Amino acid sequence: IAQCLVGSEMCIRDRNTEYYDLGLEHRNETDDQVTIDAAEATKKYGVAVKCATITPNAARMEEYDLKKMYKSPNGTIRAILDGTVFRAPIVVKGIEPCVKNWVKPITLARHAYGDIYKNTEFYIDKPGDAYLVFEGEDGEERKELIQHFDGAGVLRGMHNLDDSVKSFARSCFNYALDTKQDVWFGSKDTISKTYDGRFKEIFQQLSLIHI
């Protein structure tokens, strides 16, 4: 396979390739530092090939005797790269699509920073109030009640950054221009008026630049 990819008898291993073991056991040995190192190397060289990895759950923690329940390595790498995940179909003559009148590929683009991959969450085992709190560096504090808990439940906090969303939007528009595809934006801004609404605002602003 290596020879076919390179197009010669020279093996990929001879091309100063760096390898990072993202197996669960090695991630546990390094406290997941190896995942960070792999992401930084990807930023340095501008290219990487990644094999499938395991994101541990409670059963995996016991099976591998892990120090903690490590986060998704994909999520860690994407957060460091601040990239966009493009899922494009492989179009091959002779293979008919499920929807036969689709003659052009549909590419899905997903923002790869923040949201659930960098969320903070915990289990609540007693009644009480949950708040969303922001403390500005200038001393200003904003505090909003999320929910009054009458009993046990779960809580999650997520975030995103304007700069990252702008980078995501630019990636989408540039990809669309390169591949001559239209851009269709989807969000739940009718419900998430601030969070998803901010995505919509940024895409709208940058779309005017690319028109």
Locate predicted features.
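Single conserved hydrophobic/aromatic residue that forms the stacking wall/gate
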Residues: 1-7, 209-210
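N-terminal glycine-rich phosphate/adenylate-binding segment common to multiple enzyme folds
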Residues: 26-137, 141
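Active-site loops and adjacent core secondary-structure elements that bind or stabilize anionic groups
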Residues: 10-11
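Active-site pocket-lining segments that scaffold enzyme catalytic pockets across diverse folds
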Residues: 159-208
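Short, ordered loop/turn segments at secondary-structure junctions
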Residues: 22, 53, 188-190
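A generic structural signal for short coil/turn motifs at secondary-structure boundaries
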Residues: 1, 27-28, 191-195
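An N-terminal, well-structured beta->alpha segment
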Residues: 137-170
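N- or domain-start disorder-to-order transition segments that initiate the globular core
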Residues: 15-21
